């Protein structure tokens, strides 16, 4: 089974979900809705977009049902991690149960909420 990949140019969580639902097959929609409810808080999404401001292009991959990887590039096309953003998110109570890590131009968001 190949990895799911989509590039997004969106302004809000509603848009990201709508774009993903258009890109992926119908059988993936329940997983995407779980991602929306459990993981894509405004705080997480806003912080990722802040990092990707120059292009607003996010490449999303879903290596597992509990993990989403967002890759982004700056205006020169270079990978651009922002560790201070990850630290801010880690301390945000709204992201409890969600870990966010920025590395090598990617933002990995992992859900750690069993049974939710």
Regions found by a protein language model. Give the residues of each.
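Residue-level signal for functionally critical sites in structured catalytic/ligand-binding pockets
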Residues: 17, 30, 35-36, 107, ...
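Conserved ATP-binding N-box helix of the HATPase_c
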Residues: 31-57
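Short acidic/polar alpha-helix capping motifs at helix-coil junctions
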Residues: 8-10, 21-23, 34, 89, ...
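A short, compositionally biased N-terminal segment around positions ~18-40 that is enriched
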Residues: 22-39, 77
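Helix-loop-beta hinge of the Bergerat
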Residues: 2-30
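Generic alpha-helical secondary structure
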Residues: 13-17, 34-41, 82-84
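Conserved beta-strand-loop-beta-strand hairpin that lines the nucleotide-binding pocket
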Residues: 1-3, 47-116
């Amino acid at each position: 089974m190949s990895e799911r990949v989509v590039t997004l140019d969106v302004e809000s969580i509603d848009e990201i979900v709508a774009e993903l639902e258009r890109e992926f097959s119908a059988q993936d929609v329940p997983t995407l809705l779980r991602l929306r409810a459990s993981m894509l808080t405004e705080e997480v999404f806003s912080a990722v977009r802040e990092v990707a401001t120059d292009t607003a292009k996010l490449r999303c991959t879903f290596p597992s049902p509990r993990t989403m990887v967002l890759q982004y590039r700056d205006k020169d096309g270079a990978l651009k991690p922002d560790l201070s953003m990850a630290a801010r998110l880690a301390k945000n109570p709204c992201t409890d149960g969600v870990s966010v890590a920025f590395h090598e131009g990617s933002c990995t968001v992992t859900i750690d909420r069993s049974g939710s």
